């Protein structure tokens, strides 16, 4: 019988909520188009090869603060990865594309000398239809951090010429649609300071083990060359992809099979 029983409800939705149906079809078409492109162009049907997070943070024992457990934030392990990588550059410059509430900035800023955040200001957020609470939450956790400079601008249209070749670590977490990720990735590579510099992309994964094909394609198409693409990996147990300077061991772990466990102690701040 298959799913023919859904034909009636689908047709009703086409008449009663056509915009929602078209939006869903557009998203599905983009995902499948990007998936097909990645496979045909780069041969990566299984996604990026994966690095074990323990290889980047072998002595992982850290505390994540300012964690909201709300939509729009990163996973705990994403922040742990950012902090582990930031510790490589205690005197370095970090730039983040898309910071919103500033949870990641609050976690990274104590570990680096200079932090730059680029994100929409209130006017831009209202223009794209963000609710009032989201507008008020902008920079909530990055306000007052002494080494954080916030630039309220669209990363896709900003002139990065003054920052080219000056950043030790770049975190790309702004637009998650293919065109925007491609533009941000191209910009990120121009900001790399030297051969030790790192790029981290958030939401490469829809989950810990499944690629987000729009973001994935944007990363690959935005990278300058195959030599750069060879150094881009997924980090296990996170939603992140990374561009790394060093040679690392990577593989395709068996989906669903745990190779490690984590211990989590959870508290709430009294406020």
Protein language model features and the residues they cover:
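Short linear sequence motifs
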Residues: 3, 19-21, 30, 35, ...
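Acidic/proline-rich low-complexity IDRs
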Residues: 5, 10-12, 21-24, 55, ...
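Class I SAM-dependent methyltransferase Rossmann-like catalytic core
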Residues: 45-89
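S-adenosylmethionine/decaboxylated-SAM
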Residues: 66-70, 79-271
